[in-house]
Amino acid sequence: MKLDLGCGNRKREGFIGVDSSPDCGADVVHDLTQMPWPFDDASVDEVHSSHFLEHLDGAERMAFMDELYRVMKPGAKALIITPYWTSVGAIQDPTHKWPPIAEQSYFYFNAEARQRLNVAHYPIRCDFDLAFDGTLAPGMEQLPPPQQAYAKSHYFNTVFELRAVLTRR
Protein backbone atom coordinates (compact mmCIF):
# COMPACT_ATOMS: atom_id res chain seq x y z
CA MET A 1 0.00 0.00 0.00
CA LYS A 2 1.24 3.48 -0.91
CA LEU A 3 -0.26 6.59 0.71
CA ASP A 4 -0.29 10.23 -0.39
CA LEU A 5 -0.95 12.05 2.90
CA GLY A 6 -2.59 15.46 2.65
CA CYS A 7 -2.94 14.91 -1.09
CA GLY A 8 -5.29 17.82 -1.79
CA ASN A 9 -6.16 18.11 -5.48
CA ARG A 10 -2.80 16.64 -6.57
CA LYS A 11 -3.01 12.98 -5.61
CA ARG A 12 0.08 11.11 -6.74
CA GLU A 13 -0.58 8.41 -9.33
CA GLY A 14 -0.48 4.89 -7.89
CA PHE A 15 -1.05 6.13 -4.34
CA ILE A 16 -4.10 6.14 -2.08
CA GLY A 17 -4.91 9.80 -1.48
CA VAL A 18 -5.74 10.81 2.10
CA ASP A 19 -7.10 14.26 2.88
CA SER A 20 -9.56 15.89 5.27
CA SER A 21 -11.48 17.55 2.43
CA PRO A 22 -14.21 15.54 0.73
CA ASP A 23 -14.01 17.96 -2.22
CA CYS A 24 -10.48 17.16 -3.44
CA GLY A 25 -10.96 13.65 -4.77
CA ALA A 26 -9.13 11.86 -1.98
CA ASP A 27 -9.66 8.11 -1.78
CA VAL A 28 -9.81 8.28 2.02
CA VAL A 29 -11.34 11.31 3.74
CA HIS A 30 -9.64 11.56 7.12
CA ASP A 31 -8.24 14.38 9.27
CA LEU A 32 -4.60 13.39 9.75
CA THR A 33 -4.51 15.15 13.13
CA GLN A 34 -7.02 12.57 14.40
CA MET A 35 -5.42 9.37 15.64
CA PRO A 36 -5.45 6.54 14.90
CA TRP A 37 -5.43 6.73 11.14
CA PRO A 38 -7.61 4.15 9.38
CA PHE A 39 -4.68 1.89 8.45
CA ASP A 40 -3.30 -1.21 10.15
CA ASP A 41 0.04 -1.33 11.95
CA ALA A 42 2.99 -1.90 9.59
CA SER A 43 0.74 -2.01 6.51
CA VAL A 44 2.20 0.80 4.37
CA ASP A 45 5.05 0.30 1.89
CA GLU A 46 5.60 3.92 0.82
CA VAL A 47 4.40 7.40 1.75
CA HIS A 48 4.40 10.68 -0.12
CA SER A 49 3.40 13.93 1.56
CA SER A 50 3.91 17.23 -0.20
CA HIS A 51 3.29 20.58 1.47
CA PHE A 52 1.24 19.22 4.35
CA LEU A 53 3.56 18.98 7.39
CA GLU A 54 4.07 22.76 7.59
CA HIS A 55 0.34 23.11 8.33
CA LEU A 56 0.84 21.27 11.65
CA ASP A 57 2.15 22.78 14.87
CA GLY A 58 4.91 21.13 16.92
CA ALA A 59 2.66 18.84 18.97
CA GLU A 60 0.71 17.83 15.85
CA ARG A 61 3.98 17.07 14.02
CA MET A 62 5.10 14.76 16.81
CA ALA A 63 1.77 12.89 16.75
CA PHE A 64 1.87 12.76 12.92
CA MET A 65 5.35 11.21 12.93
CA ASP A 66 4.45 8.64 15.58
CA GLU A 67 1.36 7.63 13.61
CA LEU A 68 3.38 7.55 10.38
CA TYR A 69 5.84 5.23 12.10
CA ARG A 70 3.00 3.00 13.33
CA VAL A 71 1.49 2.43 9.87
CA MET A 72 4.76 2.05 7.92
CA LYS A 73 6.41 -1.33 7.44
CA PRO A 74 10.02 -1.65 8.68
CA GLY A 75 12.25 -0.41 5.86
CA ALA A 76 9.42 1.56 4.22
CA LYS A 77 10.23 5.08 3.03
CA ALA A 78 8.33 8.34 3.33
CA LEU A 79 9.13 11.37 1.17
CA ILE A 80 8.03 14.55 2.92
CA ILE A 81 8.29 17.81 0.97
CA THR A 82 7.96 21.16 2.74
CA PRO A 83 8.98 24.75 2.07
CA TYR A 84 12.55 25.26 3.27
CA TRP A 85 12.83 27.38 6.40
CA THR A 86 14.86 30.11 4.66
CA SER A 87 12.48 30.45 1.73
CA VAL A 88 9.68 32.97 1.62
CA GLY A 89 7.37 30.00 0.95
CA ALA A 90 7.83 28.90 4.55
CA ILE A 91 6.30 32.09 5.93
CA GLN A 92 4.06 33.58 3.22
CA ASP A 93 1.07 31.26 3.74
CA PRO A 94 -0.97 32.29 6.80
CA THR A 95 -2.04 28.66 7.32
CA HIS A 96 1.56 27.51 7.92
CA LYS A 97 2.34 26.91 11.57
CA TRP A 98 5.43 27.63 13.60
CA PRO A 99 8.25 26.67 13.45
CA PRO A 100 9.36 26.56 9.81
CA ILE A 101 10.93 23.22 8.87
CA ALA A 102 14.67 22.58 8.47
CA GLU A 103 16.72 19.40 8.38
CA GLN A 104 17.27 19.71 12.13
CA SER A 105 13.50 19.54 12.68
CA TYR A 106 13.60 15.87 11.69
CA PHE A 107 16.34 14.89 14.18
CA TYR A 108 13.66 14.62 16.86
CA PHE A 109 12.18 11.70 14.92
CA ASN A 110 15.36 9.60 15.25
CA ALA A 111 15.90 7.84 18.61
CA GLU A 112 19.70 8.21 18.59
CA ALA A 113 19.47 11.92 17.82
CA ARG A 114 16.99 12.40 20.68
CA GLN A 115 19.55 10.81 23.01
CA ARG A 116 22.35 13.07 21.71
CA LEU A 117 20.14 16.15 22.03
CA ASN A 118 19.17 15.17 25.60
CA VAL A 119 15.48 15.13 24.70
CA ALA A 120 14.79 11.41 25.03
CA HIS A 121 12.09 12.37 27.54
CA TYR A 122 10.03 14.03 24.78
CA PRO A 123 6.78 12.16 24.06
CA ILE A 124 8.01 10.78 20.72
CA ARG A 125 8.25 7.06 19.98
CA CYS A 126 9.13 6.95 16.28
CA ASP A 127 12.57 6.08 14.97
CA PHE A 128 13.43 6.99 11.38
CA ASP A 129 16.67 7.06 9.44
CA LEU A 130 16.93 10.43 7.69
CA ALA A 131 18.20 11.72 4.36
CA PHE A 132 17.74 15.17 2.82
CA ASP A 133 17.71 16.92 -0.51
CA GLY A 134 16.51 20.33 -1.59
CA THR A 135 15.03 22.11 -4.56
CA LEU A 136 17.32 24.99 -5.45
CA ALA A 137 16.22 28.34 -6.80
CA PRO A 138 16.57 28.74 -10.59
CA GLY A 139 20.18 29.30 -11.61
CA MET A 140 21.64 28.00 -8.33
CA GLU A 141 22.23 24.48 -9.65
CA GLN A 142 24.67 25.94 -12.21
CA LEU A 143 26.98 27.31 -9.51
CA PRO A 144 30.01 25.28 -8.41
CA PRO A 145 29.32 23.20 -5.26
CA PRO A 146 31.33 25.48 -2.91
CA GLN A 147 29.31 28.51 -4.01
CA GLN A 148 26.06 26.55 -3.68
CA ALA A 149 27.01 25.54 -0.13
CA TYR A 150 27.84 29.14 0.79
CA ALA A 151 24.57 30.42 -0.68
CA LYS A 152 22.53 27.73 1.11
CA SER A 153 23.94 28.73 4.48
CA HIS A 154 24.01 32.51 4.02
CA TYR A 155 21.19 33.61 1.71
CA PHE A 156 17.42 33.45 1.81
CA ASN A 157 15.44 31.92 -1.05
CA THR A 158 18.36 29.76 -2.21
CA VAL A 159 16.57 26.52 -1.35
CA PHE A 160 12.82 26.52 -2.01
CA GLU A 161 11.83 23.07 -0.79
CA LEU A 162 13.21 20.54 1.63
CA ARG A 163 12.82 16.92 0.59
CA ALA A 164 13.19 14.60 3.59
CA VAL A 165 13.29 10.84 3.13
CA LEU A 166 12.38 8.98 6.30
CA THR A 167 13.06 5.24 6.48
CA ARG A 168 11.28 3.34 9.24
CA ARG A 169 13.74 1.50 11.45
Where are these regions (language model features)?
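Class I SAM-dependent methyltransferase SAM/SAH-binding core
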Residues: K2-P36
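Conserved Rossmann-like nucleotide-binding pocket used by diverse enzymes
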Residues: I16, V28, D40, H48, ...
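A short acidic, Gly/Pro-enriched loop at the edge of an enzyme's catalytic core
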Residues: T33-V47
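Active-site micro-motifs of SAM-dependent methyltransferase domains
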Residues: Q34, E54, Y108
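GHKL-family ATP-binding catalytic core of two-component histidine kinases
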Residues: P38-D40, D57, A102
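A short SAM/SAH-binding and catalytic strip from SAM-dependent methyltransferases
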Residues: D45-E60
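S-adenosyl-L-methionine-dependent methyltransferase catalytic module, highlighting the catalytic core
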Residues: E60-A63, E67, K73, K77-R169
